[in-house]
Amino acid sequence: MNPDNTIAVITETIPIGMQFDKVYLTTFNMWREILSNTIKTLDISSFYWSLSDEVGTNFGTVILNEIVQLPKRGVRVRVAVNKSNKPLKDVERLQMAGVEVRYIDITNILGGVLHTKFWISDNTHIYLGSANMDWRSLTQVKELGIAIFNNRNLAADLTQIFEVYWYLGVNNLPYNWKNFYPSYYNTDHPLSINVSGVPHSVFIASAPQQLCTMERTNDLTALLSCIGNASKFVYVSVMNFIPIIYSKAGKILFWPYIEDELRRSAIDRQVSVKLLISCWQRSSFIMRNFLRSIAMLKSKNIDIEVKLFIVPDADPPIPYSRVNHAKYMVTDKTAYIGTSNWTGNYFTDICGASINITPDDGLGLRQQLEDIFIRDWNSKYSYELYDTSPTKRCRLLKNMKQCTNDIYCDEIQPEKELPEYSLE
């Protein structure tokens, strides 16, 4: 495969009703493009399946129907999905259509879940991003991902991660991965590709460390390296930012690695840091305190800012939707697109992956991701940490209707904390 033929495209889902001056190719259209061009094989790693539409458009149903038709065209389809305690009707339909399915019990193996979301088509084309196999991810949840076409080398490397999941569907965790599914590329030896005539260095990282086979870069290592190598700025857009590990016993442990690297970059190297964190009705109150702590560092010589991103509600409201679910970072050098929230457990016992791309000219895909971040940061959907919100969508901001003229709306009385794992 000639690496000069590689095509890479940023994709996103903009929830119905939100308005931006510039948007990129939709997740729905990209998935359809991949499905229509799949000839021999399709591998999908997924958290759960809920494509059968419940409200509004039939986008999810369209995708599900097209996947169901693939075996009839002679396409071998494999689906690795997190083992659930309740039946997944969509998955049962896939199995009836001839799709090979393995339920991956990461809870039993590591105590976490299979949270990775990616596709591999014909061992040549890939998609990786925040979107779940859920109709909401096509119309009601803000998502971001990347599709890369015509690169067998990168597809083969991502397939090695899929094979790890596929193996765990019927086997226990091996003593070590020395003889299993080695990585072809990593942070020290990235793959060189040309996208639109521009050379890019790219590699795929995986989490947690226990599932990183020989030569595979751990996702946390890739993330910290991305921050540490920045010279001018680090822009982050994630659903959750909580430097905590939640234990099975109900205890919490401080997990400072990402936060420390961000603080160090802003203070020691005067790198501009911007955090755009999602806020909705299920946001954790403890996250607000950590974000305020970071934001308080801003001063004459420390450029660090935090905003909350609120997706307006639907009418009528739709459960588990209307939130910015993206998980990416962009610096002046590198684009990082992942599948994990920035909470400790997502790097210690939950399965995730990321694509790390560095263009030689500093532009290309990295520039596109920067443009998306700045668009969202400056939009009417972004709020300061001490703002009041015109909607009840954000659990961490005071609603305007709750404020009086003589009381500054600052403190919020915390409600009972919600479970850490919900939509995410």
From Swiss-Prot:
The keyword Repeat applies. GO terms for molecular function: endonuclease activity. Keywords: Endonuclease, Hydrolase, Nuclease, Repeat, Viral envelope protein, Virion. It is found in: Virion. It comes from the Viruses. The keyword Hydrolase applies. Induction: Expressed in the intermediate phase of the viral replicative cycle. Its main location: virion. Belongs to the orthopoxvirus OPG042 family. PANTHER family: 5'-3' EXONUCLEASE PLD3 (PTHR10185:SF16), PHOSPHOLIPASE D - RELATED (PTHR10185). DNA nicking enzyme that cleaves extruded cruciform DNA at its tip. Probably nicks viral hairpins. This is Virion nicking-joining enzyme. It comes from Monkeypox virus.
